[in-house]
């Protein structure tokens, strides 16, 4: 196994341990035992428990950032509504394809420490700004109802986070496409005019 595969192996097992036990209860000994590597091997790749936890969260942030594509009202192949649904679908899929990391992101990472809280807040603020700008653009095109785009962005993120929290934490059995349809319907009954 090469170094990148070994690193990925440790990350995957650490994610599983964090998802099962929570950050504070997770121990490096359990991570290395689950990964089948020596403790020294862990430290070749990661400084400490926090470093591996932070990398897991950072990778999820990156995947989410790549999942969202700017809506193009001039796209002749995909309607605005289809593009919006595609973005919702991409976000939902990214978070539900890895429920362990989503659990970590929505529950275990919150309140870890002030520096990590700032990192999470920064991610949510950046997501909110991107969504807010998309909503302002949509308002200019008549695709989004007039109103406070900042509030709309917070409400939208809150709805998505709560839906995924319920699915991941409570084990509610909702098909991804049903979640996409319901979220799109919710937005369509509110500010969306697509």
Where do the PLM segments sit?
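Helix-turn-helix
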Residues: 9, 17-51, 55
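Hydrophobic alpha-helical connector segments
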Residues: 55, 69-97, 152-156, 177-180
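Short secondary-structure transition hinges
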Residues: 93-130, 140-143, 169, 173
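Amphipathic alpha-helical packing segments from all-alpha helical-bundle domains
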Residues: 62-69, 114-140, 150-154, 162, ...
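N-terminal intrinsically disordered/low-complexity leader segments
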Residues: 1-5, 194
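Generic hydrophobic, amphipathic alpha-helix propensity
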Residues: 6-14, 31, 52, 56-67, ...
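C-terminal peripheral helix-coil segments that are non-catalytic and often amphipathic
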Residues: 89-97, 129-140, 159, 166, ...
């Amino acid at each position: 196994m090469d170094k990148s595969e070994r690193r990925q192996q440790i990350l995957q097992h650490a994610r599983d341990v964090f998802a099962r036990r929570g950050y504070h209860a997770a121990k490096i000994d359990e991570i290395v035992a689950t990964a089948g590597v020596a403790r020294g091997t862990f430290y070749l790749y990661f400084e400490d428990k926090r470093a591996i936890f932070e990398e897991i969260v950072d990778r999820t942030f990156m995947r989410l950032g790549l999942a969202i594509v700017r809506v193009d009202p001039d796209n002749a192949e995909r309607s605005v509504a289809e593009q919006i649904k595609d973005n919702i679908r991409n976000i939902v899929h990214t978070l539900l394809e890895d429920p362990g990391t989503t659990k970590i992101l929505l529950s275990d990472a919150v309140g870890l420490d002030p520096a990590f809280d700032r990192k999470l807040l920064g991610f949510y603020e950046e997501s909110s700004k991107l969504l807010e700008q998309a909503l302002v653009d949509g308002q200019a095109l008549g695709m989004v109802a007039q109103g406070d785009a900042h509030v709309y962005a917070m409400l939208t993120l809150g709805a998505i986070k709560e839906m995924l929290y319920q699915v991941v934490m409570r084990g509610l059995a909702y098909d991804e496409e049903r979640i996409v349809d319901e979220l799109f319907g919710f937005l369509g009954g509110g500010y969306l005019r697509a």
